[in-house]
Amino acid sequence: MNVRPGLTTLAHPDGMRRTLRRALSMLMVCVLPAAANAVPYVFDSGDFLAESSAWEAWADMLTRHATQFDGLKGCLDDKAACTRRMRSLHVVLSQGTALPREKQIRLVNRYVNRKRYNEDRRKIIRNEEGKLTIPSHWATLVEFLEKGGDCEDFTTAKYLMLRHFGFAAEDMRVVVVYDRSQRAHHAVLAVRFDGETIWVLDTDNRIYRKRRPLGYRYVYAVNELGIWDHDIRLPRRRR
């Protein structure tokens, strides 16, 4: 029988699977950001772990987003057809279309960061090993604009809006970081544009161009094309 792979059925060594499960559960513990360390984010293919479809919650969000966004066509064409919460989206997407890449990124970062911050609701399930895992719910752009969300929802909303502006999936990643100063995990968006320019967008309107915030350690990244586990290269004593 053809079974769509889930997080705990990936055909990877046990250590990599444990790292992936840990990274996914980390998304539940998001904090507001800290300040800048000296290593830029690198769009490296060496940490590739799996196709993005292996993470069902992420894949399901992308499917819901496509359906919901298709239903917004009337609103995007005519502001009068928008619901109250979608009017601002119409304005931003309409005005931002003709802007250069740098200004589109700044516009989206500011727009999304004004939205309501809500902690994600936790769901506890058992995997085949009998251990409890805590998956995170991924909100679509429409769901986020209607209800707010936590750090990964802010980051995903930016990702989806920039995709509408024509940014390639391969040039963006939702990145989970560990904030050593807060002793918690957080999500940011890495964006590559104009060749090799890379910016990291945070939830406090900061944009890191060449340096990441002090104490941030990259753990995990995802986009429409795949999942990257940055943590597998780190010596155990540094984790």
Predicted regions located by residue number:
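A structural boundary/capping signal
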Residues: 2, 36-239
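Bacterial N-terminal signal peptides that target proteins for export
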Residues: 3-24
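N-terminal regions of proteins, emphasizing targeting and processing segments when present
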Residues: 7, 33-35
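Bacterial N-terminal signal peptides
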Residues: 23-33
